[in-house]
């Protein structure tokens, strides 16, 4: 790699609203505040609720429409 053309990476602390914190390398540096992370997002935390309309559409799709 060429020297002097790549940005400097600094340790950056990411703080979530749920209290989870983690540190990564980033060009920004300092602290970044997040609304959600993998610990509190419903999809990753297993709290995602699928609405009944989804099941209705799925049943219609799997059953197929009868053409007359």
Curated annotation (Swiss-Prot):
Keyword rRNA-binding listed = yes
Role according to the record: Binds the 23S rRNA.
**The species this protein was found in:** Aquifex aeolicus (strain VF5)
Q: Which GO terms describe its biological process?
A: translation
Q: What is this protein called?
A: Large ribosomal subunit protein bL31
Co-factor binding details: Binds 1 zinc ion per subunit.
List required co-factors. Zn(2+)
Cross-referenced InterPro entries: Ribosomal_bL28/bL31-like_sf, Ribosomal_bL31, Ribosomal_bL31_A
Question: Quick one: which residues bind Zn(2+)?
Answer: 16, 18, 37, 40
Its cellular-component GO annotations read: ribonucleoprotein complex; ribosome
Gene3D superfamilies with a match to the protein in the record: 4.10.80.400
Superkingdom classification of source: Bacteria
Family assignment from sequence similarity:
Belongs to the bacterial ribosomal protein bL31 family. Type A subfamily.
One GO MF term on file is: rRNA binding
Listed under subunit, the entry gives:
Part of the 50S ribosomal subunit.
Which NCBIfam families does its entry note? L31
> Keywords of this protein's UniProt record, alphabetized?
Metal-binding, Ribonucleoprotein, Ribosomal protein, RNA-binding, rRNA-binding, Zinc
């Amino acid at each position: 790699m060429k020297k002097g053309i790549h940005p400097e990476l600094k340790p950056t602390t990411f703080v979530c609203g749920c209290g989870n914190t983690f540190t990564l390398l980033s060009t920004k540096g300092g602290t970044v505040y997040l609304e959600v992370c993998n610990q509190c997002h419903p999809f990753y935390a297993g709290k995602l609720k699928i609405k009944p309309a989804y099941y209705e559409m799925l049943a219609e799709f799997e059953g197929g429409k009868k053409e007359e």
